[in-house]
Amino acid sequence: MCCILAGSREFVRKNPVATKRALRAILKANEICAADPERAVRALVDRGYARGQDTALQLMRELPYARWRDYDTEATVRFYALRLREAGMITSTPQRIIAGSTDWRFVNELKRELKG
């Protein structure tokens, strides 16, 4: 998985419905990018987020937007935390980061709700 969505503990605790809605919107946008990359690129170009339509379309087609359900998000965090620790950029272990800084319940619920 390439991307991470982060929210403060306090916000997520106080606003679980808003948190889940935001995550759902992002995941649905991923599905639009996968199902209709031309539409997604038009929106990016029209809003000035991308200049070259051909390059943006090629990129949109090559990125695995529809595969978010297939990724093991915990394994991804573990992998990158280990690399960051090996590089001396963090001191926490991957296990501590996962135990103290992750909450998979929204992703797991949406995997069930948003059937692919």
Feature roles, as predicted:
Residues 1-2, 51:
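A glycine-rich, aromatic-flanked flexible loop/lid motif
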